Curated annotation (Swiss-Prot):
Its cofactor is heme. This is Cytochrome P450 2C31. Keywords: Endoplasmic reticulum, Heme, Iron, Membrane, Metal-binding, Microsome, Monooxygenase, Oxidoreductase. The gene is CYP2C31. Its EC number is 1.14.14.1. Belongs to the cytochrome P450 family. The lineage of its organism: Eukaryota, Metazoa, Chordata, Craniata, Vertebrata. One of its GO terms (cellular component) is endoplasmic reticulum membrane.
Length: 284
């Protein structure tokens, strides 16, 4: 919904949109089901809660709720718990799946890149075991490909909105306290000074002359600073293990000539959505 024109109408007339037909009604239904599921899980945690031995985030939140139950201004409420769990659940699944989908599309478009990744997988991991995170440091090309996928697709072009907590002087500008700030990650990820030919998918953007992985402060796929994505470590791990596992066991085959594969996003709003594409997974 947030990456379609419907979001503009929803923001202006949230109560009316539910009466119009469209795929957004499926989204609303799914959100209701997700909220119901989360509430059921919270109730299970309430029944099994051990104040001296909390097991997870929900347990810790419930304990904090109990401690602040007499504080009328507490942010530790049931509604905030449900919303936070839903945010973590949705943000931790949709972004990773979209990145992986877009990554497979780019590898389909560039078979020469796929071949180099598979050669590195054969050399470092082999075929007789599953990949692990310790392999990543010995796979600079694969690491560069993963970074280039995230840089190129520019999954969250405008980042999430922030608010200035105090008056800030930035260069010649005064930003008053309370000002909403929307930053452009695109301007960094597609900076031509840091990434030559930023509009081209090229893993060399993250490789030095010796073929070693090259870090750069301009890689901000997860934002930066104190408000950096809290799931960055998990997302990096998931993307590496999933992509390597797929290419370890399968060769990607397009149903059309790679030259005719469209890699432009089907829609670019809050998220960059990859276009629909059919592909074949041929066991290695």
């Amino acid at each position: 919904l947030v990456s379609t024109p419907w979001i503009e109408l929803f923001n202006a007339f949230p109560s009316l949109l539910r009466h119009f037909p469209g795929s957004h009604n499926t989204i609303f239904k799914n959100m209701t089901e997700q909220r119901k599921f989360i509430l059921e899980e919270i109730k299970k945690h309430q029944e099994s809660l051990d104040l001296n031995n909390p097991q997870d985030f929900i347990d810790y939140f419930l304990i904090k709720m109990e401690k602040e139950k007499h504080n009328k201004h507490s942010e530790f409420t049931m509604d905030n718990l449900i919303t936070t769990v839903w945010d973590v659940f949705s943000a931790g699944t949709e972004t990773t799946s979209l990145t992986l989908r877009y990554g497979l599309l780019l590898l389909l478009k560039h078979p020469e890149v796929t071949a180099k990744v598979q050669e590195e997988i054969d050399r470092v991991v082999g075929r007789n075991r599953s990949p692990c995170m310790q392999d990543r440091s010995r796979m600079p090309y694969t690491d560069a490909v993963l970074h280039e996928i995230q840089r190129y697709i520019d999954l969250v072009p405008s980042n999430l909105p922030h608010v200035a907590t105090q008056d800030v002087k930035f260069r010649e500008y005064l930003i008053p306290k309370g000002t909403a700030i929307l930053t452009s990650l695109t301007s960094v990820l597609h900076d031509g000074k840091e990434f030559p030919n930023p509009g081209q998918f090229d893993p060399a953007h993250f490789l030095d002359e010796s073929g070693n992985f090259k870090k750069t402060d301009h890689f901000m796929a997860f934002s930066a600073g104190k408000r950096v994505c809290v799931g960055e470590g998990l997302a990096r791990m998931e993307l590496f293990l999933l992509l390597v596992s797929i290419l370890q066991h399968f060769t990607l085959k397009p149903v059309v000539d790679p030259k005719h594969i469209d890699i432009a996003p089907s829609f670019k709003g809050m998220l960059s959505i990859p276009p629909f594409c059919e592909m074949c997974f041929i066991p290695v």
